Amino acid sequence: MEETYGYPYFLIHRGDLHKVLLDRAYEVGTDIKVNSYVSDVDETGPSVTLTNGLKFTADLVIGADGIISQASPLARNTNRFLIGIKSRIRKSVILDRDVKIIPDPNCAYRTLIPGELMANDPDLKALIDNPAANCWIGPEGHIMAYPIRNGALYNFVMCHPGSVPVGQPNERASLDDLIERYKSWDSIICKLISLVPQCLKWQNAEIEKLETWISKSGKVVLIGDASHAMVPYMAQGAAMAVEDAVAIAECLGRVTDTEQIPELMSHFQKIRLQRCYLILDGARNNGNIWHLPDGLAQQQRDKKMAQQTKPQEAESSQGNPNKWSDPKFQPWMFGHDARAEAKSYLYNVYPTTEAAKKFNADITVNTSALIV
């Protein structure tokens, strides 16, 4: 990976990634207000009003509250998570209807196994000692697993049919049911499940493709899962949000007057929308391919995937059914430079002038900085 794309494939706890981003936000002076529940968004201002009555005005509101939203007092008072179609911020962009949320047939069964529990079994110890993402695929399911925190924990995620209300957290899965489900798979899997302290069940889902991520005023914009939530079968959901952030930063870097923000948000959407929705489709399709039941289609899939491990046969094959490893799709996905793409696009339609450089040295666009 590093030889091909210039960077390694990092295996990281999502909470640790959040901490890295949070620390950097504080370093550059961001004012972050946690436990802030949004009661109203005025997209014309724009402004955001919290349930405690505080109101914040800004030049731009960036909605990054994901497929789930705690932006309503109902979410706080009843301890029930509201799905993203109830998001106050998204409702300021899509005014006339609720956005459809599309549950996947599968749930993700997530757990973290202490690395020390795996150390006494040679088969399991090898998974910790040799950092790599391991994937098992089979009938109506797959498993993705890898070590994190220098082997202190082993992230273990099983995906197979199940149902739970979208956005409901902390529903526990039966470990006995998991062992029964995977007893005919690789014996290592049941060994791992036997070490699981607890397993939480999460409904995989995506939202419908939106025609716009921008409010009518151009002063509220959606990024990340709020605009393109996808199923996890390409492991690209967080990556797309980071790419969004890079692209929107490049757009805001061209601002010489706040009146330009709506136009630049339109350019941001043009830069990002097609790629995000191609990844969204690719993730769904990859899940369908991984989860094929035993039969002819599965046998053909396995044959084509095996060909990709043999250089001579790979050259004559028509690609890998596993898009993660496909010789055409993988470079397009992993080799993408979001900053370079944004700069190239903006250079042609919105070049940075000397005046803009001087202006940007003296002014910062006021964006909302709320974690909801």
Question: Residue locations for each model-derived region?
Answer:
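Conserved FAD/dinucleotide-binding core of flavoprotein oxidoreductases
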Residues: 1-9, 13-14, 52-54, 98-102, ...
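Short, flexible helix/strand-to-coil boundary loops that buttress conserved ligand/catalytic motifs
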Residues: 75-76, 92-93, 193, 234, ...
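Conserved N-terminal helical subregion
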Residues: 1-115, 165-178, 326-328, 333-372
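Conserved mid-domain beta->alpha element of the FAD-binding
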Residues: 62-63, 80-81, 109, 145, ...
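Amphipathic alpha-helical interaction motifs in eukaryotic regulatory proteins
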Residues: 22, 26, 39, 72, ...
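Short beta-strand or tight-loop elements
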Residues: 34, 44, 139-141, 200, ...
